[in-house]
Amino acid sequence: MDTKNVIAAISLSAAVIILYSLFFAPPPLTKENLAEKNKIEQGTDAPSLDQKENVTEISREDALSQSKRIQFENQSIIGSISLKGAAIDDLTFKEYNVSLDSDEKVKLLAPRNTSDGYLIESGFITTDKNIDIPNSNSIWSTSGNNRLTDQSPVKLSWTNDQGITFEKEISLDDKFLFTIKQRIINSTDKTYDFYSYGQIIRNKIPEISNFYILHEGLLATLDDELIEEDYDDIQEEKFSKTSQKGWLGISDKFWIT
């Protein structure tokens, strides 16, 4: 009798589950629904970063002379940071030559308005169109040190007409690592939302070796997933991915930015 009761209870439970699945359960989550769900959860008010500019190409020497700069140097690299846009756009390796037959040092980064423009920018964006934020044309001011070394960081600031100050502290280790700390000082009586960003800008695709065990192109680790995108792949189709943590860069035969 107990066995019959157990079987009857199981059968009744199964019937209830089946009926609920048919009439009350939500539809299965498709890829399209999942994408829309993620979009809603992340919010649609986050601003996008779009600072595409048409620039007239000039020589490296002329480009470097067009804006005031902060010089940096340690035992491994030498270069400068442009106060226009606070861009790291001038970097030369002190210990690496272009070739075995040349004394010319390898130049990795170059100003935006050169043929091989290659630079690093960081800053903030906001959804409030009435707030002025620093962009690639903004002129930053320095305070304290005006030369960056592995022993002395530099501080930059830019203040808009609304009374909001944007600050950067840039430090350098004894090799190749820059660290940028950013903060905002809001002297107004209003609250604003800002989103920090960092980006690497490269004007053109460099010469690549096409060696099958070597990746040259975009490189990232996002949410613990390694991602490698070749230059030709992103020319054919744009690549986009959302993550909560990670890092990204551009890899060449010998260097990673």
Regions found by a protein language model. Name each.
Residues 1-4, 41, 62-65, 143-146:
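Aromatic/His-enriched, Gly/Pro-containing loop or helix-boundary segments
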Residues 69, 73-257:
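Soluble non-transmembrane domains of integral membrane proteins
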